[in-house]
Amino acid sequence: MLIINDNNLSGPLQRVNGTGELSVQFKDGRSRISRLYQEGAAKIRMPQAVTGPLEAILINTSGGLTGGDRLKWDVALDDGASAVITTQACERIYRSGGGEARIATRLKAAKGTRLAWLPQETILFNRSILSRRLDVELEEGAQMLVVEATVFGRLAMGERVVAARFADRWRVRLGGRVIHAEEFRLGPDVGAELQAPAVAGGACAMATVLMVCEQAGRHLETARAIIGEEGGCSLWRVGKASKLVVRLYAPDSYALRRRLCPLVALLNGKAGLPKVWTI
């Protein structure tokens, strides 16, 4: 276990605690907010959109997380609603002074909905500790696109991650049945572990993309062309729906985005890229 001690710290440290909850309904021909709750550092803003899905931008006003911080997001879509959820900026996980930072996300999508969970990258700094959890509940007939990208240090800033801990847990259910599960862990020797050919082959930026819908297979070949040799794409049948799973890795966040942006634009249909995404 990565243990970090700093004898210069004294007294209780202020911790980040944030909870953001958003419910979306389809009413009068549009997807609209039915419930919004914000607490602590978690804020949610909605750019005005006359047509198309509701777009929500999640904001952590603390500017980043460190050991002991907690951030929770909860998004629910009622029948027929559609929404694109993203973040204002990359989430930053700073050096831990003790304990882990936790990010917990819960998504629910009723029948006939389309939900896109598209946060910008999570950046881990040296000696950071992060536990990230994603729980998704889909009803039959719901469509979903999920992207989670992680970057270990910013090479352009001369940053390298040698020691850190990262745990990423996913559970996705369709009609009450688990159709996708992940238990990804790195650390404490992240720098060495990322060099392993079976892990990242020296890359420090990676992303997982998951699409669940009836016709996910139509994107398979185009997605593979975008991904190239630094990643992979597979298609699975899950009952009446299909599941497209993409893994990407790159030497830095810029190289990752150059492929992730066109991939998201492809899979997100007419909604395309969130307005806040840039290369």
Swiss-Prot record:
Domain of life: Bacteria
Main location: cytoplasm
InterPro entries: UreD
Keywords: Chaperone, Cytoplasm, Nickel insertion
Sample GO molecular function, one term: nickel cation binding
Intracellular or extracellular location(s): Cytoplasm
Pfam family, one: UreD
Other information: The second copy of ureD in this organism is annotated as a pseudogene.
Family, similarity comment: Belongs to the UreD family.
Function: Required for maturation of urease via the functional incorporation of the urease nickel metallocenter.
Subunit comment: UreD, UreF and UreG form a complex that acts as a GTP-hydrolysis-dependent molecular chaperone, activating the urease apoprotein by helping to assemble the nickel containing metallocenter of UreC. The UreE protein probably delivers the nickel.
Protein name as it appears in the record: Urease accessory protein UreD
Species annotation: Brucella suis (strain ATCC 23445 / NCTC 10510)
Gene name, Swiss-Prot/TrEMBL: ureD
